[in-house]
Amino acid sequence: MKVLIVDDELDVEQLYRQRFRKEIKAGELEMMFAFSATDAMSVLAELAPMDIVLVLSDINMPGLTGFDLLKFTKEKYPHLNVVMVSAYGDADNMNRASSLGASGFLVKPIDFTLLKEKIFSI
Amino acid sequence: MSNSISFDFLIKVLRKVFLFQNLPDHLVKQLSESITTQEFEAGKAIIEKGDEGNAMFVIISGKVKIHDGNEVVAEINEGNFFGEMALLDGEPRSMSVTAIEHTVVAIINRNDFFNVLNDFPAISKNIITQLTRHLRAQNDVLIAQWRSREKELNDLVEKRTEELANKNSELMLVLDNLKLSQQQLVQQEKLASLGQLTAGIAHEIKNPLNFVNNFSQLSLELLEEFKELTDETERAEILTDLKNNLEKINNHGKRADSIVKNMLNHSRTRNDDKQLADLNKMSDEFLHLAYHGMFANNPDFSCYMKTNFAEKLPKVNVFSQDISRVLLNLFNNAMYAVNKRKKLGVMGYEPSVSVTTSTVNNCVLIEVEDNGTGIPETMKDKIFEPFFTTKPSGEGTGLGLSLSYDIITQSHKGKLSVESVVGQYTKFIIQIPV
């Protein structure tokens, strides 16, 4: 199972890799990282075969936002699950995410137990 | 001579005149024969200042005033004479003479007067005495006038001085009020920008705190795991992770600390000392604070942020909270401008705000550039004026750039300038001497 994590904070990579250490080690999960929406778009475009099952994206990023990425992903790869992450869990953001086709919305700080469930329920 | 006045009467009058007191009878007669008389109604001018002086006058009846404009030098009545001075020196009349009441004068013209003088030089003494009297009288009048003017002038000076002192204390009061208002406005502006920042700050603190929490929690779990493990390679791996995590915790803790410090710095009343500051670090932090502040108030907002920091930028002695306000203000403006342009909805527009630092001629330069709406040429002169704002009412205080300008040019002896092309870009350049 392959997941793409998109966040402008570089340290999320080390954090996620440790949080999912066991799963990664056991070969149950593979993680890729992109540090901007534009990066994520090129990662997705270069992937063949498209074996990614989930994109986990921060909303508030410099340049293109998580919403831009969500729109782009849903248009180009409608089968991909996109879960949005934000420090702001207000109704506006949540409604917007779901209307653009997000399959979930997580508020920071991330509850990793919940995230794990979400990933493995796919 | 005039018909209305008898010859004998005229002789009588002339005899009474001081000038002709000791003139022999035949000369008085001779003079009387050549004399003409003239009548003047009250208010009529007998002599005008500046006239040619070709006769002198003896008052037969009535009263006249000798004056220069409104300035009356003397009033004289019958038996007195006037106009002899111009006759003697041939200069134009130096005073005017006007009848105060119905007046009859005897006119002695120049030739007749000089004939008498030739025939009887003794009257020269009378003339001199008379002239001296006139001059003394005139002198006294002038001195009195001068004294009264001097007094008037002194009184006026005293009055004006008092008025000025009053005005001065009024102005001092106004100035005090202004200073107070200014302080309040500055405080208001600080609070306004702080309010705008709050969301950005919350976000900027929350992010590192999340990392601190996550990495410390992970480390605890790693420690538990470490206790169970026996394999040395695995244990070494965990130790490396632990070390990394502790470094992350430390970094993010410092990051949060620095943000809180900046925030406190920003709102605190200024302390009097300049401190050495790393302007790269400050620019970076406030760029992100401004970004998150904008985003929190405006969920659609986003822009690219580019930083080009000079590697060996010297530290500069600055009032750091003041400089942070300038930076924040410039970043906020830049982001406001790119957002405004983005809202025009032109395809392919990529909002971008960049900050570049460099050292030029012993000055540190901070350039804040945006590709927003731009500033029209006609507004460039006004943007640094207090209360000038293009934002809708209630959104801007109009003080941001004017305060920034004062901070850079006055407290730091630097320069703040702007370059802009409408629809293309705006660049503010801060220049601070090292």
Where are these regions (language model features)?
Chain A
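A Lys-centered signature of the CheY-like receiver
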Residues: 8, 108
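Receiver (REC) domain switch/active-site region of two-component response regulators
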Residues: 111, 120
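Active-site beta3 strand of CheY-like receiver
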Residues: 49-56
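Two-component/phosphorelay signaling modules centered on CheY-like receiver
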Residues: 10-33
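Acidic catalytic/metal-coordinating carboxylates
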Residues: 36-39, 65-68
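Alpha4 helix (beta4-alpha4-beta5 surface) of REC/receiver domains from two-component response regulators
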Residues: 68, 89-104, 114-117
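Receiver (REC) domain active-site loop signature in two-component systems and cognate sites
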Residues: 61
